């Protein structure tokens, strides 16, 4: 039997891909968006800008939620691109694609629960890739100058 584990797959001069750092970059971007969104929601509820938890928000308040979540998506994608060991745009877009899949699942599960306007989860889904591109592009512009 041969020892395939000791055989290099691609030339001996290629650096390791650093899978752990790639995963961490994507997770860190998600965590940033999650924490920023939750903290903002809590503050807006505490200030009575948003109604108490359990009460349906007016549609116009979902516009504001969409705006700050879009900004947070850009920030999260920037963080992902910043931490990515290579190809920052790819990492940000992969993170956005995962977020879009999770957002789609969430939209399907909650569609008929009257939690808010139907356009809201759709807006979050379709802004994922543009947010990723903007966040990663900001990082790329920093590294190229």
Predicted features by range, described:
Residues 2-145:
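Juxtamembrane/disordered regions of integral membrane proteins
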């Amino acid at each position: 039997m041969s020892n395939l584990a000791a055989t290099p797959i691609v030339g001996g001069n290629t650096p390791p891909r650093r899978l752990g750092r790639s995963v961490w970059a994507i997770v860190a971007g998600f965590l940033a968006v999650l924490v920023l969104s939750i903290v903002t929601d809590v503050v807006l509820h505490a200030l009575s800008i948003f109604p108490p938890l359990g009460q349906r928000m007016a549609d116009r308040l979902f516009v504001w939620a969409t705006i700050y979540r879009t900004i947070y998506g850009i920030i999260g994608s920037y963080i992902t691109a910043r931490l990515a060991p290579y190809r920052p745009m790819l990492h940000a877009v992969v993170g956005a694609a995962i977020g879009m899949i999770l957002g789609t699942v969430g939209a399907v599960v909650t569609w008929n629960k009257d939690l808010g306007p139907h356009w809201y989860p759709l807006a979050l889904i379709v802004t994922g890739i543009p947010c990723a591109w903007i966040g990663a592009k900001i990082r790329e512009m920093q590294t190229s100058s």
